[in-house]
């Protein structure tokens, strides 16, 4: 079995401006939990990539999984700066 068959082995750093949230996100996270997620990403970095698919027509990525990590990168100035505005994506 070749390990390059699974997307997890091909993490890419994508500018957050090229990522679009999908229209459907059933999860609602309360502000205290979002603050904890922001703190966790600040202290430990991104430990899981977000899942996206590439839309060739629009030349952007549509977010499938990882909406709250995406939101943290977009809204936390310190994390955005440290990560150079790049989100880990498979």
Region locations from a protein language model:
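N-terminal leader or domain-start segments enriched in small/polar residues
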Residues: 1-40, 53-58
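A short, basic-hydrophobic beta/loop patch
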Residues: 4-11, 46-90
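Short, basic/hydrophobic alpha-helical segments
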Residues: 39-47
